[in-house]
Curated annotation (Swiss-Prot):
Protein name per the record: Phosphopantothenate--cysteine ligase
Pathway(s): Cofactor biosynthesis; coenzyme A biosynthesis; CoA from (R)-pantothenate: step 2/5
Gene name tied to this protein: Ppcs
Top-level taxon of the source organism: Eukaryota
Gene Ontology biological-process annotations: acetyl-CoA biosynthetic process; coenzyme A biosynthetic process; heart process
Amino acid sequence: MAEMDLVAELPRPAGAARWAEVMARFAARLGEQGRRVVLITSGGTKVPLEARAVRFLDNFSSGRRGAASAEVFLAAGYGVLFLYRARSAFPYAHRFPPQAWLSALRPSGPAQSGKLSLEAEENALPGFAAALQSYQEAAAAGTFLAVEFTTLADYLHLLQAAALALSPLGSSAMFYLAAAVSDFYIPVSEMPEHKIHSSGGPLQITMKMVPKMLSPLVKDWAPKAFVVSFKLETDPDIIISRARNALEVYQHQVVVANILESIKSFVIIVTKDSETELLLSEEEVAKGLVIEEKIVDDLRSRHTAFICDKN
């Protein structure tokens, strides 16, 4: 299978074996508690153009959807395994950019016994205390685990390890595949070892297609899980047909279809026999609601029905 061949071909990231063990323990512990667990992939991958990489082809994604969704899943009682691009949006923290902290936080007095006390006006960081409390509660309960990736190789190896970790949970596991994964890569055997120099003239690169990992995930890695993929298009006339084609090819449960211009306020939940539009009203936007709340609420109901059907 081309997908498995690619995972084997790409270099395994440092620490992958340790992370595989950590993820397996995380999933097993939450499974023993009878808790549902969702793997959220978030952010974009990048592929190196040289073996000693200086240049990369990067799939940009802020990771905001994945981070916001993680918060909603945690509030709903799920365990969350958050596989995310380093320095992309992180649950709770993404609402508060570092420059806001620098402006709002003040030392409240001299440091004593190695502790630094900080204070801020509440209106300078609205919602910060609640976000901090929610994150720390999830961390203390052991229901949140974050794992970083950077390159395509990192992502594929860690995705496989995460899927194998969640597989024993059966239908109680959900995969929420929101990462922007590279479509092209340069095989290791065809990659120049050293930095590509501009003195060689215009650059011509031949890249190979990255096989979709939905196929081995659904068929081999976690065949009993509830799997959700995402489809982003700029043409609303083709979005449903593209989503349905993905469902037919990969035989998973749900595609969340997005149109670029309305990605923050409108999605279509597509299954093999239904299309459900989710829209944020102007009033909901004014209240600070986010579309991820509606997405997760819808998927939770579908996941419940999926579990009942399997049992």
